[in-house]
Amino acid sequence: MAKLTVVYWRDIPAQVIVKAGRQTAKRQLTERFEKAIDRAAMRAKLRDTDSYLAEWRRSDPADCGDDLEAVATAEAERLEAAYDEARLAALVASGGVDSV
């Protein structure tokens, strides 16, 4: 059974990983997520490397379909739609922490 994992910086998603055995499909989210993470880190005053790196986490692996590429693409598209500019701006304003 394949497993789906999302990599986050605090509560901002950055990457989707789908893995089954030795096979892996990965999708990095678009540049707007990377920019939001950088802005949120600056707002949270996490300027040194160790503080910044300590905030990365992975979601618990979730069971998913066996077409790794399709699952990775679908989840990346879902996250792109779920995190519109307003939601990312709110996350930046809160230092990357989702207040919902």
Where are these regions (language model features)?
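Mid-chain, well-packed structural core segment of small domains
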Residues: 54-73
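Solvent-exposed, flexible loop/coil residues
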Residues: 10, 16, 33, 37, ...
